[in-house]
Amino acid sequence: MTFGRIGAGLALFSLVTALACGAENQARSNASASGAFTKGGDDRTGPYEVLEAWWKAAPDHTDGWTWGSVSGVAADTPDRIIVAIWGDQKAQRQERPGGSNYLVVVNANGDIVENWSQWDSLFNRPHQVYISPYDPDRHVWVVERGGNGVHEQILKFTNNGSELVMQLRDPQSVLSREEARANLNPGPLDFGQPAVLAFLPDGHFLLGDGYHNGRIVKYTTDGEYVSEFGSVGSGPGQFDLVHGIAVDKNSRIYVSDRMNHRVQVFTEDGEYIEEWPDIYDPVAIFIDESDAVWVLDATLNRMLKYSLAGELLDYWGAYAEVSSLGRSGWPGGMSLPHQMDMDEDGNLYIAEFGGPWLDKFVPKSGADPTRLIGKRQLGTN
């Protein structure tokens, strides 16, 4: 009796499986007949295509000199893209970066239209560059990590680069990791390799500080200290290399805790909410109007899409080396992606620190809109 029931159950299971497989095969056959799929492909650039040879050599690159590491990008308009670079370097990287070409502006075709060389003496390692989405005057902000006689600082320029309007400068020379972390109560300007800025609707801004200090510091629009949260460590609310910050429409703060391989989420007052673990090397966070949280992973060379709840929804991207190893890359290949931004036309820009180059990604014709990065999500006062 028991064997009979088992046999009947197996027969029923086989019938259901056969019907399911038949339905799946029929669906594939129908898709093939209707041309509903594209043969081949590896989705390396996701829903975007890359403008090949868009990033160009500087006019003064001669005698084997090329760009240093491209560290930051801010899209002012689709025809005005501000780029931060670690100066120049020899093409084969035998020498440290030279003291020029730290901030340049390119147009929609990638042509250099401005070089802010008048400010070269302020820079050694410009880390990232920003324009606050809440600022009608479109000031340009730069986080400088310092070194080689340059102090760590936060710099704010007029949009055209003609004037330096604010400078938050660490009075000390750059400290080592051990020296910085020995100071358990750093002051408002005791920077520890500052890394990232994020802006709030009321004009205040957040500083991720950074490589050596484990804290998020809030300042007024004029650079006055307001508050801070965080400490060095791996527990909830602690950090080991704050490298990316984004704020959603509900004023929640998302922080890429790079060396702890996670994103942490906080209230606007810095109260810990949760962590998203097992994100290998998160370096930048961008939240769009559809509530998608986009995370750039530098080691995986990948763009990751999450929900506001932390669910992984999609990803794309792949590594591509260039001529420094004697082999050519391919358009859109990533090499230690470092910062990203979007322009008003939906084009994506990624600063490739290991390239060194800046990539411009444009949406593919007919791309699935759910896979495209939308406009930046803004908060309310």
Question: What role is predicted for each listed range?
Answer:
Residues 5-6, 346:
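Generic extreme N-terminus detector
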